[in-house]
Amino acid sequence: MKTLALMSLFVLTSLNALAAPKTVTLEVPTMNCVTCPFTVEKALQKVDGVSKAEVTFKTKLAVVTFDDEKSTVKALTEATTNAGYPSTLKE
């Protein structure tokens, strides 16, 4: 019985590790004014699973933290593109 309890605990702990938030940086080169980041940030925050989005005009970068079980990088780049600001994953 103890073995079963330990194995169950291990499995549950492993599942939590898989659901860890993921952070990516997107390049958004078409931002051309200081108000553009607000539009990009708002679009990213509407994506399911996004917990944080920080967009900077000076660097033209968006740093996004999201749950990769609920969303994808493709969904993030589509959101910025649909808002008028195409983006790509910064490698």
UniProtKB/Swiss-Prot annotation:
Tell me where the signal peptide lies. 1-19
Entry GO MF terms: mercury ion binding; mercury ion transmembrane transporter activity
How this chain assembles, per its entry, is: Monomer.
Keyword line: Mercuric resistance, Mercury, Metal-binding, Periplasm, Plasmid, Signal
Q: What is this protein called?
A: Mercuric transport protein periplasmic component
Top-level division of the source organism's lineage: Bacteria
Tell me where it resides. Periplasm
